[in-house]
Amino acid sequence: MSKIFVNPSAIRAGLADLEMAEETVDLVNKNVEESQAHLQAEPIEVDALPEDMKRLQISEPKPCQLPDGTCMKEEGGDEDFYMAESGDPYIPLQSYLDTMGIQIVRKMKTGERFFKIWSQSVEEIISYVAVNFPVPPGKSLADKSTQTSVEKSKPASQPTQPKKEDQLSKVNIDSQESSGPPALDWAATNDDDDASVEAEIAHQIAESFSKKYKFPSRSSGIFLYNFEQLKMNLDDIVREAKGIPGVTRRAGDGVRLPLRCILGWVASTHSRRFQLLVNSDKLNKVMQDDINRYLAY
């Protein structure tokens, strides 16, 4: 008959587990007693309640025996300061704005530019508000005169837009033979810029900040250069880029900018190292070709 030997350490461990289990049971019982302490007190007498509590009616409300008008007044007395959801005009507006937000997110996922999406969404929201929230007829005449003057001033400025577009589309081909970036056609002026245009320019430059572009060197070869090597603030680069013909207009449309042309122009003005490496005549031709190609679209 074989003998079974038990390790003393296993016995001690088992005893320790039993002690811990007993302590756990005692702790659980104590917590249960504490949580049910309020049930061990004397029951509350109804007569001992405050006077206001006696008015509380637990039974179901009886149907109104009075005329209809009186019942409606009593039931709706507490709701005088609240508007029904069906009569609130801002609930449809909120749902419309939620729908517009979902559409904006979907368009951004497809790769469209944010500022282009936002401008279209703003126009749709303005038209929705104009249709569903018309101006009341009791408006003052001062507001109407202000709106009339604005509407009259807009048609006067519209004929100038085709002229600007014609100027932007014409690039001086003869300037390709001259040397240096100043030979660019600066007659093609940019449109009036705003914060959204600057943000679009900064966004595209920041995306390609470390990308290297090819430039013609003095040794009849090429060298690589990027925006990081300028060691300039992004705001300063954007300020210089806005002076290049067509950049502001393309940024306003949310389309791709001639980044190599922008880099070449800024570097040829602010980077001594770039000036020593680049062939000015060929650089001017490269920049002019970029502008012609981008303005053609």
From Swiss-Prot:
General function of this protein: Non catalytic polymerase cofactor and regulatory protein that plays a role in viral transcription and replication. Stabilizes the RNA polymerase L to the N-RNA template and binds the soluble protein N, preventing it from encapsidating non-genomic RNA. Also inhibits host IFN-alpha and IFN-beta signaling by binding and retaining phosphorylated STAT1 in the cytoplasm or by inhibiting the DNA binding of STAT1 in the nucleus.
UniProt-recorded name of the protein: Phosphoprotein
Keywords per UniProt: Chaperone, Host cytoplasm, Host nucleus, Host-virus interaction, Inhibition of host innate immune response by virus, Inhibition of host interferon signaling pathway by virus, Inhibition of host STAT1 by virus, Inhibition of host STAT2 by virus, Interferon antiviral system evasion, Phosphoprotein, Viral immunoevasion, Viral RNA replication, Virion
Motif annotated as Nuclear export signal, chain positions: 49-58
Gene: P
A Pfam short name: PP_M1
Biological process terms in GO annotation: symbiont-mediated suppression of host innate immune response; symbiont-mediated suppression of host JAK-STAT cascade via inhibition of STAT1 activity; symbiont-mediated suppression of host JAK-STAT cascade via inhibition of STAT2 activity; symbiont-mediated suppression of host type I interferon-mediated signaling pathway; viral transcription
Residue ranges, annotated region (Disordered): 140-189
Keyword Chaperone: yes
